[in-house]
């Protein structure tokens, strides 16, 4: 049995790298827009206000992403991973009412449901960046 193990053939997920890149691009885009459209001549004040606005907007987008992910299929995937830990540990406190084959079927269906989830995050980032640009111009 040990000789027939196969390596993990799942494709790598680059979602975290893409999301981090989007956040960095958003931060500098908002920063440049607020500097460009600012009406005062004091460069220190402009940079300080622009950095604060950019940081707060990106931080709010991160919070929004966390809320959305917890309320959708990623939250369900997290519950499945907790259940998987109980199966591996054989916990006497939490006896699962489901077999391991049923668990594998459920986890694969959750993976299929969450495959296109990054599009929803991307649309939220775009909407948030548009709102932040409008707010920073006021």
Curated annotation (Swiss-Prot):
NCBIfam families: MPN214 (NF045743). It is found in: Cell membrane. The lineage of its organism: Bacteria, Bacillati, Mycoplasmatota, Mycoplasmoidales, Mycoplasmoidaceae. It comes from the Bacteria. Coiled coil: none annotated. One of its GO terms (cellular component) is plasma membrane. It is a multi-pass membrane protein. The keyword Ribonucleoprotein does not apply. The chain crosses the membrane at residues 17-37, 43-63, 117-137. Keywords: Cell membrane, Membrane, Transmembrane, Transmembrane helix. This is Uncharacterized protein MG076 homolog. The keyword Membrane applies.
């Amino acid at each position: 049995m040990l000789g027939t193990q196969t390596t993990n053939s799942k494709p790598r997920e680059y979602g975290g790298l893409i999301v981090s890149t989007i956040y960095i691009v958003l931060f500098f885009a908002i920063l440049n827009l607020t500097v460009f459209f600012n009406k005062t001549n004091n460069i220190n004040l402009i940079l300080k206000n622009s950095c604060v606005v950019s940081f707060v907007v990106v931080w709010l987008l991160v919070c929004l992403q966390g809320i959305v992910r917890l309320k959708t299929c990623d939250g369900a995937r997290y519950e499945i991973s907790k259940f998987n830990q109980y199966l591996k540990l054989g916990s006497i406190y939490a006896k699962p009412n489901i077999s391991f084959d049923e668990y594998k079927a459920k986890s694969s269906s959750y993976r299929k449901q969450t495959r296109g989830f990054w599009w929803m995050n991307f649309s939220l980032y775009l909407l948030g960046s548009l709102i932040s640009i409008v707010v920073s111009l006021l």
